[in-house]
Amino acid sequence: KQVLYLLPEIALTVQIMERLHRVFGDRLGIYHSKYSDAERVEIWQKQLSDHPYDVILGARSAVFLPFKNLGLVIIDEEHETSFKQQDPAPRYHARSAAIVLAKMYGAKTLLGTATPSMESYYNAQQGKYGLVELKTRYKGVQLPEIQVVDVKDLRHRKMMSGPFSPQLLAAVREALKNGQQAILFQNRRGFAPMVECKVCGWVPKCKNCDVSLTLHKSINLLTCHYCGYTYPVPTECPNCGSTEIMGRGFGTEKIEDQIAEIFPEAKIARMDLDTTRTRNAYERLIADFSEGRTNLLIGTQMVSKGLDFDKVSVVGILNADSMLNYPDFRAYEHAFMMMAQVSGRAGRKGKRGLVILQTKNPTLPVIGQVVHNDYEGLYQGILEERRTFHYPPFFHLINVFVKHKYDKVCEQASHELCKTLRSWFGGRVLGPDKPAVARVKTMNIRKIVIKLENGIDQQKVREYLKFAQQQMGKDPRYGALQIYYDVDPL
């Protein structure tokens, strides 16, 4: 029988591929989006031949490959949001698709993670899934020691060196001195997340999108992370004429610059979307760090995704608060997962690792839950909130997005659509509202949320939504209007 092994991140396939290749050799096929079309067609045709691969290792798109006799589906790091395809359509979740695929073939499904998603853990608690808990780490290595550092207090006492606390610098210095490695985690790429006039507070924004621009020092340009448009860095403020234009905040590029000044002897690598655009760049970064050619890795959430490096003894989480301050009901859950996963990179083999967690709010419950690895506490606390406010795992969410070039048309159409939806779904419909980023690539956006209790007739819901979309399409005022749905959004 065949096995499908799904991973959330292409970077992970490199590490696991080497391990599986040692066992399965030519029986192993790899499939992900960094491969060329020709390479992917080749794998597809091999799957249709009389001698398909026995094991397919891949990112989310591998779930659509043809199989002859599928016996097992493994979804590693099942909590990862990367399994959800956002744009463009189809907006599917590879975990859900894989579970359906396994059902079609009568195959077994295995979900693996140290920090389960609320939905999966709830299903396990309800007896819908089986639950197996591994109480000890591989080879009995202890979980890392997590040291919480109050950066607000240190800033007040003028003891911070940029974004680095003295505790973090001391730990990194010690690790490098002993021939160990360190990882610094900052979930913002670029040099400075924002540029601002020091005199009047003017902030340059993208002309196509409703977002401020990020400074990328390596190319000396301001970049929009939504449409990719670049702008020259202004030398003077168009608002007040001041030449004091400053970068605000810390992106991975700036962290890299500053840490290189503090540790000039360190061999530093940076892992984010900008440094891993090609397949080779990914593989080279991981190989260099695995083999010790680099000893200090700075990265965004990519570094949290199940990578396994023997010599990492210190992990620094530079700004825990940035993960919590999102207008999203899953912010706490995601922050816990991200911090727990990043922490798990420390002390993989042999001795116990150390994690320095920098925050302005050390008393937040989620910080304590990360320190004590208390997933159960987090789960129970969040579950009650979700039940009260009608969120997953008790309700399904559908986000309805309305887009148009003109804001007025977008506003009007979204209100009309909302009225139609309310006639069917009543108080389950919320909105329309402007999302956090209300304009992307010159298109204005409105968002409507539908909350549906579990067990509702999905076929009927689908028919209603299709009908609503067709009705709007018939209206001559809304010829260029775009409407699309995101079911179970993340």
Language-model-derived ranges and their functions:
Residues 424-435, 477-486:
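Short beta-strand elements
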Residues 419, 427, 490:
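Conserved beta/loop motifs at nucleotide-recognition and modification sites
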Residues 439-451, 486-490:
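Short, low-order "capping/linker" segments at domain edges
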Residues 436-439, 473-474:
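Short proline/glycine-enriched turn/loop segments at secondary-structure junctions
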Residues 413-419, 459-470:
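Short amphipathic alpha-helices in soluble, non-transmembrane regions
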Residues 85, 470-473, 489-490:
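Short, Lys/Arg-enriched, disordered terminal segments
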Residues 1-54, 58-411, 419, 423, ...:
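Inter-lobe coupling/hinge segments of SF2-like helicase ATPases
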Residues 438-440, 458-459:
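Short active-site-adjacent structural elements
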